[in-house]
């Protein structure tokens, strides 16, 4: 696979221009190289800014040439790819019936207890078949990878050319290179993991050989155990033959005994049948007598029923007459009750009017009493004020000055005390 990849990369490098070819194989970049690349990436914008129009035209022409060569290569490669695909299909059809035949052969050899094929021959055959299928799949994968890489490279160059023509820079190309660098680092990680996986596969193959040996020992022990079981089977067959003979004789005796029992039971059943026949005849006779008795009773009951039906009609007619009389009495009582209710309502109205009249007279008497008391109080107040103020004919006679002064002083004191 690695040789084919190198051949394809070499053919691509011959078609491309020497100024733009770049390798994607080799060891992963070291830390120092990564630092240099980061510095170049940091300084690249300055270089891009200083590109002249002539440099842009030159680089654009080179990129157009690269795109044309890649498109031509895309039209050339599919012919070889289809041929290899048809060859891989033929080899897969030829090798398909051979691969699954090995487990059938090994299974038949184990079943017949024949010597098994050696591990070295078996490994050689497996390696031969696996190698044929692996080569076909690897060629198909390689061609697919070449086509994908060509298309990706063509897209990157086209984007870079468009950016170069638009703004005179190629930052998309630098971004694509960074992505490829990351992909290469991941590829190397995958290779290291694949190496570890191969080592693990080798250890597992060794374990598989040990397991096969253990299985062969187990098969041998199983064959010995099968032989032992066959001997036991022969002994069991002999015992079962004796047991079958004994069971046959025993069953014959049981059949004869059961046959005798069945004959005896049949005789008993016949006697029982005869008894039951006599009993059924007697029951039929009794049934006929009971039927005659029941018919007589039915006739008597029908006569009684007719009597009671006539009596029922008469009683219902009498009760209906009583009911009509009660309804008439109820109607008259209802009219009388309505008259009484009307009279009671009139009396209630009279009583209510009398009570209202009494209430009015009581309120009027209370009002007259209240007015009389108010008038008496007002007259008493007026008389008191007239006497105190000496209004009209209620003036007091004049005395000496001293007496008048004393009286005035006393009146003032009284007024102050009242206040």
From Swiss-Prot:
Region (Disordered): 1-47, 393-419
Sorted UniProt keywords: Calmodulin-binding, Cell projection, Cilium, Cytoplasm, Cytoskeleton, Differentiation, Flagellum, Spermatogenesis
Gene field: Iqcg
IQ domain: residues covered: 371-400
Quaternary structure annotation from Swiss-Prot or TrEMBL: Component of the nexin-dynein regulatory complex (N-DRC). Interacts (via IQ domain) with CALM when calcium levels are low. Does not interact with CALM in the presence of Ca(2+). Interacts with the HSP70 proteins HSPA1L and HSPA8. May form a complex with CAMK4 and HSP70.
Native source organism of the sequence: Rattus norvegicus
Protein name: Dynein regulatory complex protein 9
GO cellular component: cytoplasm; cytosol; manchette; motile cilium; sperm flagellum
Family: Belongs to the DRC9 family.
């Amino acid at each position: 696979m690695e040789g084919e990849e190198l051949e394809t990369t070499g053919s691509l490098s011959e078609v491309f221009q020497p100024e733009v070819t770049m390798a994607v194989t080799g060891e992963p970049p070291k830390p120092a190289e990564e630092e240099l690349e980061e510095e170049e990436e940091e300084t690249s914008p300055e270089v891009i800014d200083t590109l002249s129009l002539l440099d842009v035209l030159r680089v654009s022409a080179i990129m157009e040439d690269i795109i044309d060569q890649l498109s031509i290569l895309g039209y050339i490669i599919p012919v070889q790819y289809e041929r290899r695909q048809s060859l891989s299909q033929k080899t897969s059809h030829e090798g398909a019936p051979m691969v699954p035949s090995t487990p059938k052969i090994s299974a038949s050899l184990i079943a017949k207890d024949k010597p098994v094929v050696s591990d070295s021959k078996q490994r050689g055959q497996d390696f031969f078949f696996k190698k044929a299928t692996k080569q076909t799949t690897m060629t198909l994968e390689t061609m697919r990878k070449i086509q994908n890489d060509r298309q990706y490279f063509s897209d990157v160059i086209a984007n870079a050319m468009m950016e170069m023509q638009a703004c005179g820079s190629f930052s998309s190309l630098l971004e694509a290179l960074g992505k490829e660098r990351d992909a290469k680092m991941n590829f190397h990680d995958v290779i290291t993991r694949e190496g570890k996986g191969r080592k693990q596969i080798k250890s597992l193959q060794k374990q598989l050989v040990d397991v096969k040996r253990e299985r062969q020992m187990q098969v041998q022990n199983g064959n010995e155990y099968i032989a032992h079981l066959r001997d036991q089977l022969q002994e069991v067959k002999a015992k079962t033959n004796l047991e079958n003979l004994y069971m046959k004789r025993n069953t014959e005796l049981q059949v004869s005994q059961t046959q005798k029992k069945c004959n005896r039971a049949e005789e008993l059943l016949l006697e029982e049948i005869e008894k039951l026949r006599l009993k059924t005849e007697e029951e039929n006779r009794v049934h006929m007598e009971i039927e005659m008795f029941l018919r007589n009773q039915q006739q008597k009951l029908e006569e009684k029923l007719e009597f009671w039906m006539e009596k029922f009609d008469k009683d219902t007619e009498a009760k209906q007459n009583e009911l009509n009389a009660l309804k008439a009495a109820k109607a008259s009582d209802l009219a009388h009750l309505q008259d009484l209710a009307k009279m009671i309502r009139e009396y209630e109205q009279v009583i209510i009017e009398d009570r209202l009249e009494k209430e009015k007279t009581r309120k009027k008497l209370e009002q007259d009493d209240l007015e009389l008391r108010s008038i008496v109080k007002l007259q008493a107040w007026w008389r008191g004020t007239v006497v105190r103020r000496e209004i009209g004919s209620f003036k007091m006679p004049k005395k000496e000055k001293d007496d008048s002064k004393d009286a005035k002083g006393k009146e003032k004191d009284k007024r102050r005390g009242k206040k």
